[in-house]
Amino acid sequence: MSSPVVRNRNEQAPGFYRVRVGDLEVAALYDGTLGFDPHWLNGPKATMDAVVNALHEDPHMLDVADKAFLVNTGKQVILVDVGAGTWWGGGTMGRLAGNLRSAGYTPEEVDIVLATHPHSDHIGGLTTQDGQRVFPNAEVYVAKADSDFWLSAEVAANAPKGAQPFFESAQAIAAPYVKAGKWHTFTGSEIVVDGMQLVPLPGHTPAHTGYEFSSNGEKILFFGDVIHALRAQLPHPEVTAIFDIDQTVAAATRNQLLSKLANENVLIAGPHMNFPALGHLRKEGNGYCWAPVVFTDQWDKR
């Protein structure tokens, strides 16, 4: 009698999904899932009570996925954000490199990393805990005001105690790229990548930045942390998160951007939207709803 086959039934399918945007190949790459306490969101009590009551899951801890995005222009392989790696999530993160390989790429092939901001759930995948560069050939780009803020020892020393880990992780993650001359900053007027426009989206961090790629009349916007919790912040765009460094500006940025996107045919890539985190926005009541892309195995023939 043969031995029973031991199967791992705890894993899901590989975490990558491709779409075509003009001549660009775009792939969402799953890094893992974070626990998100609804109390990290700020809004009127009645609004927050309604949000929590409407959830079809544990109202005390939401699951929020974290993604990175690959853009293959035909000339360059680009990542927009790189997930958390081992810097956040207590072991639930760090799947980016494996999913990148499953999608047919290696870390060595990545030419450019565009960081929407230097929080560890967006740049943690750059660096191992022992200070090794995960993407040895990549040039990393981040807004200068964000880099100056999060990498400043002086700003860190004067920051609230609860914010210290954000500074410590940003500085440790950036260090090997700074040392190698591969950490670059922009002020907003430079051409970092052909066919890509910098989109200032301040509030979450001082210079939180989106990246809009255009190709053959089609567009995709990578909008970073404009949305943390879609089930709360799409119907109620005024709801902010405790991680927003300027909550008034963050709410204003979100309201302005969501209104614009709902009226335009721009594909959106949001790292904390439900996987594959690609879709469009539609106006719904006083807020918005998310229209995700429809799964297809014919990604390059759509």
Model-derived regions: residue spans:
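Cap/insert and terminal regions of metallo-dependent hydrolase folds
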Residues: G94, N216-R302
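Metallo-beta-lactamase
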Residues: R101-Y105, E109, E139-P200, V249-Q256, ...
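Residue-level marker for buried hydrophobic side chains located in beta-strands
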Residues: I78-V80, L114, V140, I220-F222, ...
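Conserved beta-strand hairpin/beta-sheet module of binuclear metal-dependent hydrolase folds
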Residues: Q12-A103, G210-V226
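Active-site metal-binding loops of divalent metal-dependent hydrolases
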Residues: D31-G32, V82-G85, P118, A145-D146, ...
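Basic/polar N-terminal segments that are highly enriched at the extreme N-terminus
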Residues: M1-G15, T296-R302
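Active-site metal-binding motif and surrounding structural segment of the metallo-beta-lactamase
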Residues: A65-A68, G74, G90-Y141
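Histidine-centered catalytic micro-motifs
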Residues: V113-I123, L201-H208, A269-P276
